[in-house]
């Protein structure tokens, strides 16, 4: 699947930054210079959404994040033009601050998280916006108000107990929705955090740039650190991991920089790597 200049139903851009599956099993693909592409469950052709001069189109070609809310709307975080909401019933995009709601400070979106009432939007050097889903009001928190050492937020995760996990260039923070204050967890060091998820067993997985992957048990606070070991084919394939995903069958997969993608083997506590040698088009994978 790639961009074909001669086919208007192909991908709009070969630089893929984000892949997201919605509740209808449709696939959304965010790109670096081609906006967002959509393919329905049984489709073979992509619909392209790019900025146009007419109203209610996406605000940017540079798509960083995609998330679906409880009503089936797709929220699109861009790297240079704020946050858009796509309504699948009307087929239009609305930008926060342009078409609905007050202006959001989150013009450079790095992370999105959907809960029952809000969309949490982490920004580049500008803290966090909480956007009320129904009236689009925006509540802003600076990095200082949240207790962060710096104001960028690269990863957001809500665990089964309602705790919010934040990742940035200073490591991992965890906090409470009611107080909106966060505490840095020193167990993860001063790692640059790319992604955080909670798996179906309740473990917190943390992906870093240059420092591998952490697996953390919130119950007993035990932590395990996985890194690439030269010559070890069943170790993590790269220490720079951009994304973590769990499949419906409970498999944990990792996208890496120059290491292809890895699957965690739970029983053996090791990894299987899939790279250009196994047919991937590139050894650098994103979201």
Regions found by a protein language model. Give the residues of each.
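Carboxylate-rich, polar loop motifs that coordinate divalent cations or form catalytic acidic clusters
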Residues: 1-287
């Amino acid at each position: 699947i790639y961009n074909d200049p001669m086919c208007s139903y192909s991908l709009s851009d070969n630089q893929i930054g984000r892949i997201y599956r919605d509740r209808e099993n449709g696939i959304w693909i965010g790109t670096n210079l081609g906006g967002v592409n959509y393919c329905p469950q049984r489709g073979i052709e992509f619909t392209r959404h790019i900025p146009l001069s007419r109203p209610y189109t996406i605000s940017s070609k540079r798509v960083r994040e995609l998330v679906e809310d409880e009503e089936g709307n797709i929220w699109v975080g861009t790297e240079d033009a704020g946050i858009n909401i796509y309504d699948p019933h009307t087929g239009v995009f609305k930008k926060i601050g342009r078409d609905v709601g007050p202006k959001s400070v989150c013009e450079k979106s790095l992370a999105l998280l959907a809960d029952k009432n809000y969309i949490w939007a982490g920004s580049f050097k500008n803290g966090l916006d909480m956007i009320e889903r129904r009236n689009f009001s925006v509540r802003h928190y600076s990095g200082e108000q949240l207790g962060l050492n710096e104001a960028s937020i690269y990863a957001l995760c809500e665990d089964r107990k309602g705790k919010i996990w934040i990742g940035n260039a200073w490591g991992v923070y965890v906090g409470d929705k009611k107080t909106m204050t966060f505490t840095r967890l020193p167990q993860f060091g001063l790692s640059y955090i790319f992604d955080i998820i909670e798996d179906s067993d309740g473990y917190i997985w943390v992906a870093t740039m240059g420092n591998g992957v952490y697996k953390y048990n919130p119950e007993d606070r035990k932590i395990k650190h996985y890194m690439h070991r030269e010559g070890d084919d069943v170790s993590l394939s790269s220490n720079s991991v951009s994304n973590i995903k769990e499949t419906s069958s409970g498999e944990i997969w990792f996208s890496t920089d120059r290491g292809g993608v890895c699957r965690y083997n739970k029983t053996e506590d090791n990894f299987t790597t899939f790279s250009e040698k196994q047919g991937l088009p590139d050894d650098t994978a994103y979201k």
